[in-house]
Amino acid sequence: MASASPRRQDLLDALGIKYKSVPAELDEHFFPGELPRKAAERVAREKAEAVARNFEHGLILAADTIVVCDGKVLGKPQDEDDAFLMLSHLSGKSHEVITAVCIKDIDQAESEVESEVTRVYFRSLSPMEIRTYISSGEAMDKAGAYGIQGLGSVFVERIDGCYFNVVGLPISRVYGMLARRGTNILRNE
């Protein structure tokens, strides 16, 4: 897996998938005018390709998650002030969480990229709630500056779509992509 994300690791561990975590050393930038979904897909592919250079065989799983609100892409916050601005922007609104997944089959020299979109609805947040949340430390390593699986869950009124996508890995989609490559995680082999 081309990621050091503890949330993605937890999800794969829960499914019993054996993997090696190798973070991709990559500048996750977006090009001017690039559509958010296409940008996330490109970054996921670049992560998979960067990590694949270190292996001769196997499958590489890479993902990139972004948050989009009012047309603005929110990645991981640079600092606490940036996190405050992001959460203030999300307050009382809905936004999209886009996770792009790339599976690179080194043996077949093929890559497959898909993405999942989940709409998340935030309640209105007070500045004090935002500051308290940021002081927990949870905001700093997550796209959009919140984690739906932790304290950030108190901000969420509802979601439309895949919960695991918001966590960082759309499990059902990953299952389908792996199954098409001959890897059935439901078998005990």
From Swiss-Prot:
Domain of life: Bacteria
Keyword tRNA processing: no
Catalytic activity field: dTTP + H2O = dTMP + diphosphate + H(+); UTP + H2O = UMP + diphosphate + H(+)
GO biological process, any: nucleotide metabolic process
Coiled coil: none
Cofactor: a divalent metal cation
Compartments it resides in: Cytoplasm
Enzyme Commission number(s) from the entry: 3.6.1.9
PANTHER family to which the protein is assigned, alphabetical: BIFUNCTIONAL DTTP/UTP PYROPHOSPHATASE/METHYLTRANSFERASE PROTEIN-RELATED (PTHR43213), BIFUNCTIONAL DTTP_UTP PYROPHOSPHATASE_METHYLTRANSFERASE PROTEIN-RELATED (PTHR43213:SF5)
Protein name in the entry: dTTP/UTP pyrophosphatase
